[in-house]
């Protein structure tokens, strides 16, 4: 079998799919994207395509190594996201050839179901509480929400109180009937992260995500030493080599590699194994589309340390398309009691509505993340 063609489709809301075709008619789908940089990743995919056309898609490990090691400069969000989507599609092809789901090819199930959590938007406590109530009505009991708005390097007590007040009202409204993680989104400086984490401790969030930027990872063990709240990080780390340094330093309780950013299934399964050796949980980052989610689920179901799975149904970013709008077999993604079951169809287990993909790709938006500024006019972290 040989790879004959690679096609990319930029899609709403902020996704990109790729299709790898073979000379035997078997097709694989992947989802390579950096949100806000889809065109750049698309160019990288097609640069890799110059080598991949004519190659045997079954040699996933070799093709991965060529893409990663074949150039003098390597790594980073663009290259690793391009590799990630290609890798997903190659696994999809292999599963279809062997008539088995990807998790079966990776050694089989270690669990029967995986807990999902849902994003909750809203700028005011009442909006967040209302959103949680609606999601509880469809079976969710675990959530993630923004821990704060933009915050200065050294901010005032009003900003701290506003963040804490939201969390306090949520805990008061629901008690311990729900669990929620707080995403600092890397928008908090190390000094302010210390303050916020201390103030939030009484409300027992499930985790604090990206308390500081990945560039400031040396603060993870320092922050962890002052709190009982688990620290989660990893969505802006792109290879096992970056995760290696974080694991060796300690402090992070949950790793969150993104299957569409960190080298795909091949790389993230290795990252999961490294995390297990350090007694660190796995919770793949996934605010993206259905192919990315499917890839995450296959890794979850073969990784003993997977604890829960993010998914983007109803997320506030999804303007122009929802998670399953491009999927024919929507029923396979149904959750029971807030849990995903294994995907059972061959390959990734996602049947893509190609006609709809082609149609909506004709006018795909060029999504960009917002640009925030502080009161003094300087740029703030989004």
Swiss-Prot record:
Keywords: Lyase, Magnesium, Metal-binding
Annotated EC: 4.2.1.6
Residues holding Mg(2+): 183, 209, 235
Protein name: D-galactonate dehydratase
Annotated InterPro entries: DgoD-like, Enolase-like_C_sf, Enolase-like_N, Enolase_C-like, Galactonate_deHydtase, Mandel_Rmase/mucon_lact_enz_CS, Mandelate_racemase_C, Mandelate_racemase_N_dom
Domain of life per record: Bacteria
Enzyme class at the top of the EC tree: lyase
Taxonomy of the source species: Bacteria, Pseudomonadati, Pseudomonadota, Gammaproteobacteria, Enterobacterales
Cofactor list: Mg(2+)
Gene Ontology terms describing biological process: amino acid catabolic process; D-galactonate catabolic process
Keyword check for Lipoprotein: no
SUPFAM superfamilies from the UniProt entry: Enolase C-terminal domain-like (SSF51604), Enolase N-terminal domain-like (SSF54826)
Active site: 185 (proton donor), 285 (proton acceptor)
Transition state stabilizer (site feature) positions: 310
Swiss-Prot/TrEMBL catalytic activity: D-galactonate = 2-dehydro-3-deoxy-D-galactonate + H2O
GO molecular function term, any single one: magnesium ion binding
């Amino acid at each position: 079998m040989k790879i004959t063609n690679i096609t990319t489709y930029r899609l709403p809301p902020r996704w990109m799919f790729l299709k790898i075709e073979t000379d035997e008619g078997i097709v694989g789908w992947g989802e390579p994207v950096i949100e806000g940089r889809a065109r750049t990743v698309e160019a990288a995919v097609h640069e890799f395509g110059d080598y991949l056309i004519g190659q045997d898609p079954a040699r996933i490990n070799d093709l991965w190594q060529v893409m990663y090691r074949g150039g003098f400069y390597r790594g980073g969000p663009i290259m690793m996201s391009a590799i990630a989507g290609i890798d997903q599609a190659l696994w999809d092809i292999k599963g279809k050839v062997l008539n088995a789901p990807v998790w079966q090819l990776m050694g089989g199930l270690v669990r029967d179901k995986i807990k999902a959590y849902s994003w909750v938007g809203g700028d005011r406590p009442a909006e967040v509480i209302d959103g949680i109530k609606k999601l509880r009505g469809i079976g969710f009991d675990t959530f993630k929400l923004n821990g704060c708005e933009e915050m200065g390097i050294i901010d005032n007590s009003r900003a701290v109180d506003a963040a804490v007040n939201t969390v306090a009202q949520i805990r008061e409204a629901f008690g311990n009937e729900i669990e929620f993680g707080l995403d600092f989104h890397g928008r908090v400086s190390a000094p302010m992260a210390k303050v916020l984490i201390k103030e939030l401790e009484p409300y027992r969030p499930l985790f604090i995500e990206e308390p500081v930027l990945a560039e400031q990872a040396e603060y993870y063990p320092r922050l962890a030493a002052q709190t009982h709240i688990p620290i989660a990080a990893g969505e802006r780390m792109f290879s096992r080599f970056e995760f290696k340094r974080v694991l060796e330093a300690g402090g992070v309780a949950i790793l969150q590699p993104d299957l569409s950013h960190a080298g795909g299934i091949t790389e993230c399964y290795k990252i999961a194994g490294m995390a297990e050796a350090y007694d660190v949980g796995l919770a793949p980052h996934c605010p993206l589309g259905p192919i990315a989610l499917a890839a995450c689920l296959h890794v979850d179901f073969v990784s003993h340390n997977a604890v829960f799975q993010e998914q983007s149904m109803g997320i506030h970013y999804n303007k122009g398309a929802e998670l399953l709008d491009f999927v024919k077999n929507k029923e396979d993604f149904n959750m029971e009691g807030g849990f995903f079951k294994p995907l059972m169809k061959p390959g990734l287990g996602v049947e893509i509505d190609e006609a709809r993909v082609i149609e909506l790709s004709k006018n795909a938006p060029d999504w960009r993340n917002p640009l925030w500024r502080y009161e003094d006019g300087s740029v703030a972290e989004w």
